[in-house]
Amino acid sequence: MPNHPLAPTDPRGLLRRRTVLKAAAGASLPGLSTAVWAAGSDKPEKEEVRIGFIPLTDCASVVMASVLGFDKKYGVKIVPTKEASWAGVRDKLVNGELDMAHVLYGLIYGVHLGLGGPKKDMAVLMSLNNNGQAITLSKALADKGAVDGPSLAKQMAKDKREYTFAGTFPTGTHAMWLYYWLAASGIDPFKDAKVITVPPPQMVANMRVGNMDGFCVGEPWGHRAIV
């Protein structure tokens, strides 16, 4: 059978594919490229960029880029702003108070799709963390032998009461991990347990006063709960 005119073995097809890909890449930044070349300058579109972050280990790339002056090389000034909650980050991204943010993948998809709030186009520019979160159970549960999913399920079946767990944002990665982990252990996260939203820096304090039985959050808060 003869090769298709645009099959990978045909140099013309490969060249056309590369041309299309280059055109698509250029089209993804229409405002920036137009502004730059219309002015005949390589100046950044913005000289000061406000980047929101939540105090988690994976915010280090953003914060240290500012502290060590890596931004100066590109003619911009990074202004890192410490935020209190993921909901606050979402709202500031939507209303323009923040130019970009260290943020949960699920949160960005939620905003892009208009889930749980206003809809606004979003783009993920880079990954700062691959996994890195932990599920932590209270010392009271651990003392009763609940140290993993199966033993937690046994304890919940034995001691019938309301069990409360926390994630950091309804459409966030931590909530997804928590739901999946509970379900995999035979615990219905929507019927057998109560799942609440708590900002990462407040997880340990809420655990200490008995407001929750466990939580899922990014580091260093899981480690802080242990030490």
Name these PLM-found stretches:
Residues 4, 19-38:
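N-terminal export signals
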Residues 17-18, 179:
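Short, cationic motifs built from Arg/Lys/His that form the positively charged side of catalytic pockets
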Residues 39-190, 194-196, 211-226:
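Short, glycine-/small- and polar/acidic-enriched structural segments
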